[in-house]
Amino acid sequence: MQRINQNMTGYRMPAYVEEILTENYCKNFVRMSIIKDSGKYSFSYKPAGLSRLDPSSMGLYEKLLLIRNLISMSETASDHLIEAESYLIEPELVYSKGGNVDINSLRLLYYPDIKKLEFRYKIVLFADRILNRNIREEREMAERIRSAAEPRDINRLKMFLDKTILRLESNMN
């Protein structure tokens, strides 16, 4: 697969974030290089062995597992000093090995979020974008995710997702 290139102006990336990303210390992100020139950033991603994930071909179980794993990935990124508010979380930026949604197969394209939207809102918006509003069960799930994320406690949302995923797993067996 070829490289993916993005350019950005009007942003200043902390040097430690640049090092963490370019040295691939945090494995949650697609390998990348960064070139700075006169206030302009050029991001070049090398998604070797990865392809963009297509949530439209997934069932509810896989979509919820994807959301839950993105939360776990954000916690790992935070452990590496890259806060979830600092980068975009959108379906187009999620890459995977073989279309799998397990945490070891997923990677994100790091692209700065200038607005620094609160993480719980990003997850709710992500869920809204991947859950199909034409399917009653998925539409209701989007509402439940929104409700679980409302009290500013990401642990509540994690518990809700964990319970729902376990329930769906038991129904599959």
Regions found by a protein language model. Name each.
Residues 1-67:
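Conserved structural core of kinase catalytic domains
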Residues 1-3, 8, 73, 170-173:
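Gram-positive cell-envelope targeting signals
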Residues 42-44, 88, 105-109:
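Ordered hydrophobic segments in well-structured contexts
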Residues 64-71, 122-124:
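Well-ordered, non-membrane alpha-helical segments in soluble/globular domains
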Residues 72-85:
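Protein kinase catalytic-loop region centered on the HRD/HxD motif
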Residues 82-98:
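A short glycine-rich, hydrophobically flanked beta-strand micro-motif that places a catalytic Asp/Glu
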Residues 97-172:
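C-lobe/activation-segment region of protein kinase-like
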